[in-house]
Amino acid sequence: MPLGDCNISTPDNKQNRKNQEIRVPRVRVIGSDGEMVGVLSRDEALAKAEEEGLDLVEIQPQADPPVCKIMDFGKFKFEQQKKANEAKKKTKQVEIKELKFRPVTDEGDYQIKLRNMRRFLEEGDKVKVNIRFRGREMSHQELGREMAARIEADLGEDIVIESRPRLEGRQMVMMIAPKKKI
């Protein structure tokens, strides 16, 4: 018994019935060359598919009568899988990039981190800004708030602040996302 004829329940079997799984008495048949054959009984369509050494696959079960095509089911499944993989590749996963600052971060370092932040946002990633306080810096949290405000001002209108600066232990955290393009 060929593997394709097993009664294993897979998502593909649920979507496209083939050969003996088709239960309707009459079907509209499309030949293996893509030409319309016409409306045939299920048995005639199965005989025609078997004659060509191919499968009868139900393409549109909602149509009246259902549309079936004579094709190689294994190849059809492979093509569907390939299309699904291509669609999956095209979707970009949004990553969260983290940049760490100190309230006393030097101007050169600040500019480099700002440039990296812009690049991450242009690529569509979110940025987590982390301003870390050490020792007595905790008593000067206003420096951290000023740093967060400066970052927000320097990035301009191209961003959305997802979460305002908030204190978590010894660090101030702020989330920035790119503005959606319309």
Swiss-Prot record:
Pfam families: IF3_C, IF3_N. The keyword Cytoplasm applies. InterPro entries: T_IF-3_C_sf, T_IF-3_N_sf, Translation_initiation_fac3_CS, Translation_initiation_fac_3, Translation_initiation_fac_3_C, Translation_initiation_fac_3_N. It is found in: Cytoplasm. GO terms for biological process: ribosome disassembly. Keywords: Cytoplasm, Initiation factor, Protein biosynthesis. One of its GO terms (cellular component) is cytosol. PROSITE patterns: IF3. Monomer. Belongs to the IF-3 family. This is Translation initiation factor IF-3.
